[in-house]
């Protein structure tokens, strides 16, 4: 076993890192409905590519509206009153989830290798962090399965009143490409814990780990129709979920632009419940009294983790004037140390962007930063001859009106801005349509508490960044989304509260 982390903030002990599988065989490329594998109704398939070398991995069945209809029918049948799933003890649902966690742990190496090949994620990150988080999240939800219950209510009059926390029903779940397996688990685990059935659409760029999970869900013993997985494209399969009249809830992680379309579709159809985890442009505020070593390192990781492809990336770094130049110097030095390459190889610290579209978007935003007057300190262009690699890029002298300071870049591009006063930086930090996360680095508890309450964000970190746990709710303010995932709050998103009142002859206290 080995430890990772700084002396002042050590990370938990992590398992030893094995070598990735050298010859990964892709077994599951069809649509998963009713615990069975199906070709798409149309017979269409789409290609899946490795972003590190642009080579085709395989072809996957392309689901569309007809396949979503099939999956919803299966999920609805599994949710019927009297079905094996609806009559199952809550503790048994928890046992099945724990069994699923055991299987994920057993196949951790396969899934981590798949995430690296399919999504360009560093194998070390996938194995140690992503798979570790998946297993913990499943077990956390498993533990809650028989602890979700209502209350008795002291209603006036001769009545006995209680509440029931019932599953919402059939849940459509649309998964992003940046954390395909983690987001799959974030969505299915609480839904199943509460007794719902699900129809999942993984991102077309990264469908492989979700399909592999279908095999584990069947092996764990979940009844047919409880989990259905339909790979496909947003405008077809995703839109079919959003507009479906027999889906009771949709949960989506992705761009704010698509989130708006999903909420609009819900409003135009059956007013299905909607949980949205959308974009961000998160402020990270560094005061002169902060521990500069830790602040610079957390700011670096908070931006460059997974090639900057994180919704919570600390992409607006505000540094107090007295330490600005030194902070910029350290940031440049840190970025220049990166080793880019095949995410399966040991020693590689940055992999590729997910696809050509994202690659070009990031390069265009870098060019806009140059044209608008930001100082390019390092990086600024593509890397290598093959794959969608971009050099770690640092800009200084960034102003709030520049595109790179306003738009979500979703790439390895760090923007460093200067501030003088507390009131000024609070206003600037909140001057955005987003509100997903924020951080402040200071040794002054009064400053920390001031910012914890003043910053308009669903998560505020103090003297750390990207600290996540299955117990902690996560979600956005403003246009970064609605609702919460993880923690007890996340479970509440998957239940409906019903009030039951019974007339009785006499009520006694």
Swiss-Prot record:
Annotated site residue numbers, Transition state stabilizer:
178
Broad class of where this protein is predominantly found: cytoplasm
Recorded catalytic reaction(s): these are: an aldehyde + NAD(+) + H2O = a carboxylate + NADH + 2 H(+); all-trans-retinal + NAD(+) + H2O = all-trans-retinoate + NADH + 2 H(+); 9-cis-retinal + NAD(+) + H2O = 9-cis-retinoate + NADH + 2 H(+); 11-cis-retinal + NAD(+) + H2O = 11-cis-retinoate + NADH + 2 H(+)
- What does UniProt give as GO cellular component? axon; cytosol; synapse
This entry's Enzyme Commission designation comes to 1.2.1.19, 1.2.1.28, 1.2.1.3, 1.2.1.36
Gene Ontology molecular functions: 3-deoxyglucosone dehydrogenase activity; acetaldehyde dehydrogenase (NAD+) activity; aldehyde dehydrogenase (NAD+) activity; aminobutyraldehyde dehydrogenase (NAD+) activity; benzaldehyde dehydrogenase (NAD+) activity; retinal dehydrogenase activity
How it assembles, according to the record, is: Homotetramer.
The task this protein performs is described as: Cytosolic dehydrogenase that catalyzes the irreversible oxidation of a wide range of aldehydes to their corresponding carboxylic acid. Functions downstream of retinol dehydrogenases and catalyzes the oxidation of retinaldehyde into retinoic acid, the second step in the oxidation of retinol/vitamin A into retinoic acid. This pathway is crucial to control the levels of retinol and retinoic acid, two important molecules which excess can be teratogenic and cytotoxic.
Protein name per UniProt: Aldehyde dehydrogenase 1A1
